[in-house]
Each structure stands twice: as C-alpha cells, then as structure tokens.
Amino acid sequence: MNGDVLAPVVLVGMSVREVQARDLLQEVAHEHRATVAYLQMGDPSVSAELTRLADRGAERIVLVGVSLGSLAPAASWLRRIAGHWLRQRPGRRPVVEVATRLANDPVQVREVLGLLRPVTGAEAGLESAAWEDVPGHRHQALVCRGPRCTAMGSDRTAEAVILELMRLGQSDDDVLITHTGCQFPCNHAPVVSVQPDDVWYGDVDPDVARRIVAEHLVGRRPVESARLPRTRRAQAGDEPLV
C-alpha cells in the first residue's frame, strides 16, 4: 500500500446490495483491520467516515470500493465523492488514496489495495448539466429495499428490473427506477409500486419483475396476477377519482 501500512483502510459498499451484505463486509473489514462505509443508502457515509478518521489525526486514508453485484456505480464515483470531501475539508487535510478498481469479492480486496491513486481535489464535482432537470419519464418504478423486502430478495428484483429495461432499450427518460425504504405491505415482499399509475405489486421475484417491465412499464398494461389491492381513504377536499 505504498508505504505506510498503518494508514486507515475503509471498505466502501458501492450499492444497496453491499448495505444488505453489511455483516459480510464487516467480516472482510476485520480481516484487513479496516472500517466500513457506504456510498449510498447506508451509514456511515464515506464523507462521515473520512471526517471521523481525519478528526482522529489520520494523515493518510485508503478507500477501497466493494461491489458484490452488477449494478454498482463505477470506481470513479468514489473518487468524485472523496474529491468533494477533500475540497470541503477545513484545516489540515489527510492524503486520501482510492483503489483504481472495485473489489468484486472479498478475495480481491487485498489485490486492489495495491492499486491506489491519490485524490487531488481536482476530481469532477457533484454537479453536472446532465443532472439539472427532472427526467422526462412516463413511469417511475419504486423498488422497496426495506428490511423485509431486502431479506426476501429485493436486490435480485431490482437487478432484474434494471437489466430488463436495459435489454428493451429503456432509459431514465422512459422509466425512472428508484430504490426506497419500506413501502409498508411487507407481507407481500418484495414490493414494487409504479407511478403515476398507482399500481402496487407483491411477491415480485425476478421472473415477475421482468413481466412488469415488459407488460406494464413498456407495454402499459398492468400485470393483474401480481397486483396488490389498493384502496384510498377519502379526505376532505379530494378530487373525485376518475
């Protein structure tokens, strides 16, 4: 690791799948005397862990991105986040090094620890003209990643939805996929809801997920066999439902 073997190492879960695999990530971190942080939807965040280590006096910090699935952001996103943190860090700043590629399984962590590049602060920022406008999507599919849905395999559901949309040539301007916390009807996990159609699906395994994509999100016909009943309590001032 380029010299100082005592530099704190942080294993960074890059996607929601690594948040689900928290226990495994902690085991791997223990083997490398490392800590764990998450790029998204998990605590601590990368920025929070960098701040904690820097405040404790670390002069050098090593970040290794870990992806146990197929849908994690590229390693460049970890550099982007670390670069933003470095620019915003007041006072003394540690040297931050990031592995140039992700570890795709526990065995690869040791290998990528030898592939480090310093963060300079000149990395791309967190804003871009490409991210200015709300996408022009006709549907938003919300995939529940709450505790029960996660335990029932919603990571595979999400992966199936995304890969099928890609296979059918759909982009964020067609269907926007959003990972959510608990959507409530947990007995029917994994749950997926589709807006603005207000259609809810339960027991969405990968096969059902692919049907939802092809028949509903692309074909615009809800999959009735997987649909959950949906009632809405009338409130004062509500417009009548058409």
Language-model region placement:
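Local cysteine-cluster metal-coordination motifs and their immediate loop/turn environment
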Residues: 139-154, 177-198
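Active-site-proximal alpha-helix that buttresses catalytic centers in soluble enzyme cores
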Residues: 1-131, 183
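Short Fe-S-cluster ligation motifs
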Residues: 172-188, 208-240
